[in-house]
Amino acid sequence: MLHDVVAAIAAWPRRPACSLVTSDPFALELARQYDFEIIPDPANPGETGAIEMATNVCVERGIDYTLVIPADIPLIHASELDQIFAHAPEQGSVLAPAADGRGTNAAFRRPVNLFPLRFGNDSFKPHLAAAQSTGKPCIVLQLPGIALDVDNPENLHQLLSHSGETRTQSLLRRWSLSGLVVTGTEGA
């Protein structure tokens, strides 16, 4: 999935400077292959800790905005990134929820530390509340490619039902997951 996300962002004609927070060898190679800056996370602080670390790096460098994209949204498309930037306020945020409305699958903030990001189960409502509490505009966009994150077996079936041939879809089809039994779901 990470490969699909990084490749989609790299192919985006309006791509700004991009960073990948990781110390994973496979992810490091992808970052190099697609010319992403690497922000090492040797302590592996988890998603929220990695984003806080990257936010601090951006503040130190005087970066104007951040767009945080997770690695588990293989259907992301450049047109959706265009929509985020088209709606981005001069000061404020844009949030794109997961399809179930519980998780946050894209978070644009200007300035970069406008409000803290806290990922995990049910992150969307807290992110929306934090964004609104700043008094700055907060735009919520429903973006179908970004909305489908893969958190559980049911999401794999949803991914397979979409047209297209991302690397992830191709791999799932090779694995022939049509017989996979879905017994429950986890949080986004």
Question: In which residue ranges do the predicted regions lie?
Answer:
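Short phosphate-binding loop-to-helix
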Residues: 32-65
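Short, high-confidence coil segments that cap the C-terminus of an alpha-helix
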Residues: 15, 63, 89-93
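Conserved alpha/beta core of the MobA/IspD/sugar-nucleotide pyrophosphorylase nucleotidyltransferase superfamily
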Residues: 129-188
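Short, glycine-/small-residue-rich phosphate/pyrophosphate-handling segment
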Residues: 109-131
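Conserved donor-nucleotide/metal-binding helix-loop-beta segment in metal-dependent transferases, i.e.
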Residues: 76-101
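The conserved acidic donor/metal-binding loop of glycosyltransferases
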Residues: 70-74
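A short, N-terminal amphipathic alpha-helix
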Residues: 1-15
